[in-house]
Amino acid sequence: MSAIVDIFAREILDSRGNPTVECDVLLESGVMGRAAVPSGASTGQKEALELRDGDKSRYSGKGVLKAVEHVNNQIAQALIGIDANEQSYIDQIMIELDGTENKGNLGANATLAVSMAVARAAAEDSGLPLYRYLGGAGPMSLPVPMMNVINGGEHANNSLNIQEFMIMPVGAKSFREALRCGAEIFHALKKLCDSKGFPTTVGDEGGFAPNLNSHKEALQLMVEATEAAGYKAGEDVLFALDCASSEFYKDGKYHLEAEGRSYTNAEFAEYLEGLVNEFPIISIEDGMDENDWEGWKLLTEKLGGKVQLVGDDLFVTNPKILAEGIEKGVANALLVKVNQIGTLSETLKAVDLAKRNRYASVMSHRSGETEDSTIADLAVATNCMQIKTGSLSRSDRMAKYNQLLRIEEELAEAADYPSKAAFYQLGK
């Protein structure tokens, strides 16, 4: 009864008004699974290919009708009749059908839409929530959220080079309490920005995007907002950064235009260490350019024992590249973005590899999102213990947070909120 009888994709719009792929998978039992694919703004060079039409007369070339056609034709023909519970087998068929290292023929936006929709259909057919279908019957942790309250870089039109300034409510006793903490700080930050004459418009991920003179000024604003909301920075709340350093790395140097400075990798590692020493920063993502392995090694040696160093553009959720990073001893955490690799099975392999080597995993959204909340279930299913899914505004971000509230409610006493234990790889 769980055989696939129909697969149908369509072009929908994401949170930036750009086209993306949504897929429906219908099973013999009559149940349907639906999934929509996100899209990034700052992307790693080694990410799986997001197939765009290139037809400038439609959506400035960003249409996805080719990817939709691939789903409705080649992929559907290859998968109809197969049991939806055979997730790995289904994903492998698509990988072989594509025949490239980076999903360059079918498009990762085509394969991922199908992969996630198959999992949703199979979960529905089994009478299980997605997180239980993928994660089994064991104990589960709700993730500590990384909440992006100040946006810079490619996510905002302002003076900040560092892309994301985030808060992590580690003092909370539950996810519900953590979400409340984040929301209260977010609203306190809005009042603070208002009082200082900063605009309170938001960036792609729902955070504020004020024009500030330095990154320290952004962090100081976060300290003030945390205290104004009645919490203690460094105790109740820790900070996290996504530098997205590849976006300002040029000719072997890191150029912070807002501060009028350029740094070698050793100097930039010292710059980040200075921020860590001055502010309660527990996590830094993409602190070096994705190809600057020497810089990553320096940063890991300098900060890896006390700060989570997350590889996003560095690892692109690719098990092969992650294995290379583990062997070289760079970073200590993996950012997990399903569309960087293009199938659910490969995503789960990357998380498993990270865990086996004591690297933390952070489940993540993209800056171009939809109402799809699959990553919320994935964060719980994989026991990632951390999730990064934007600020406390924009319904595309709230969809994930609200799904986590529902999951915590369903799990009841079985739900664990890990707090600082989410950073289990530190101090090893």
From Swiss-Prot:
Q: Name one GO molecular function term.
A: phosphopyruvate hydratase activity
Q: How is the cofactor bound?
A: Binds a second Mg(2+) ion via substrate during catalysis.
Record-given protein name? Enolase
EC number(s) reported in the record: 4.2.1.11
Please list the cofactors this protein needs: Mg(2+)
> Where's it found, cell-wise?
Cytoplasm; Secreted; Cell surface
Catalysed conversion reaction: (2R)-2-phosphoglycerate = phosphoenolpyruvate + H2O
Supply one GO CC term from the record: cell surface
- Annotated pathway: Carbohydrate degradation; glycolysis; pyruvate from D-glyceraldehyde 3-phosphate: step 4/5
PROSITE patterns, sorted: ENOLASE
Q: Where do the coiled-coil regions begin and end?
A: none
Binding residue positions for (2R)-2-phosphoglycerate:
163, 337, 366-367, 388
Q: Where is the signal peptide?
A: none
Q: What is the lineage of its organism?
A: Bacteria, Pseudomonadati, Pseudomonadota, Betaproteobacteria, Neisseriales
* Residues binding Mg(2+), per UniProt: 242, 285, 312
Xref: CDD domains: enolase
Organism domain of life: Bacteria
